């Protein structure tokens, strides 16, 4: 079922499905944009797709046009019950009631979702860590938060960006104006893709992410002071900085993802 400006209120009112602020729900009501987002996923014949936070099914409608198996997951039982009725005759769409952060996502090769603000970082981290067969992910998030995942230096840079850049690459796709949603959020949204490299050593990348996560928890501390939590020995920290050609006075936001990988490998070899 296509969701658009003309039918949204009729459908939502008939099914008594008002947006829930607790779930950060803003429904996309521009089908042309929905189609662009789904097209950006580059779905291929054998892909297994998972959608998080389908709401009334704005993206699900276009996913259902493919012959691939798509699983849509939402924690809001109202939306789940609605979608189960809409797609009960479509064997390619599986509707699941669950918290995405408690869902087994390991089998899926493509991931898509309009992510609510309150779980954006947590959801993206969860997919990166657990969707081990994924090759591409396409998300829509509030534009003001995109830098957290795209930047590799500066005040918006953080551990999730480290993980993204060590597992693959990120690309900005397009911006969606606030008026394309109901209710309209306070800012525009950005659609972006994460491409996962199958040849990456996931274990090493995740280890580096854990180091970055710990260091960014004290982002105003210098790297040498931060590393005291790991090595407890100033001489060893000095040697690490010498061996890695790392300025000990740098702060976490000044360290590139590749250097976090080298720091992690060094720490693991000096346990």
Annotate each predicted stretch with a short phrase.
Residues 1-214, 242, 269:
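Catalytic cores of RNA-modifying enzymes
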Residues 190, 194-196, 200-239, 244-259, ...:
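An accessory alpha-helical subdomain
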Residues 264-271:
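Short amphipathic alpha-helical segments
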